[in-house]
């Protein structure tokens, strides 16, 4: 399982990496991106299954990244991270289909819970595709 952490602040990317509880979840590879453009390159080249992205970033924000992922990397599971606690903003982000919306400063249990949920969703999706290919489920 591969993880991409996208945030314009190095300290936040580093904190997320260090908050991951290896007892609960482990990743084979963890990639970092400082902005939208770097994130797109990582997604194209490495196909991470789980993506944690900040919402407020310079130039292109996390919403733009989420919309790109929904179009070009549909199986990736996204967790949004932000200091924005405006209800309509959170609701708009969740409606895009992200796994969770976490507020900064991050809570270790919330982060690990969201990561576990994202991995579970990804695995369920892959199992569905496998069963569909075998003809065991219909659309």
Pin down the residues of each PLM region.
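Active-site residues of response regulator receiver
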Residues: 7, 54
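Two-component/phosphorelay signaling modules centered on CheY-like receiver
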Residues: 10-31
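Short amphipathic alpha-helix used as the core "switch/output" element in two-component signaling
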Residues: 41, 63-74
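Receiver (REC) domain active-site loop signature in two-component systems and cognate sites
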Residues: 57
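Alpha4 helix (beta4-alpha4-beta5 surface) of REC/receiver domains from two-component response regulators
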Residues: 64, 85-100
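Interdomain helical linkers/hinges and coiled-coil/dimerization scaffolds
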Residues: 94, 100, 106-139
């Amino acid at each position: 399982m591969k993880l991409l952490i996208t945030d314009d602040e190095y300290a936040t990317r580093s904190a997320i990496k260090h908050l991951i509880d290896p007892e609960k979840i482990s990743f084979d590879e963890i990639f970092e991106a400082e902005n939208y453009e770097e994130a797109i390159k990582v997604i194209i080249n490495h196909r991470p299954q789980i993506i944690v992205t900040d919402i407020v970033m310079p130039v292109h924000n996390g919403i733009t990244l989420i919309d790109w992922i929904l179009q070009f990397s549909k199986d990736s599971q996204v967790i949004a991270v932000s200091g924005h606690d405006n209800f309509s903003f959170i609701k708009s982000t969740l409606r895009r289909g992200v796994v969770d919306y976490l507020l900064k400063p991050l809570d270790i249990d919330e982060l690990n819970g969201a990561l576990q949920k994202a991995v579970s969703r990804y695995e369920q999706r892959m199992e569905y595709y496998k069963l569909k290919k075998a003809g065991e489920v219909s659309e």
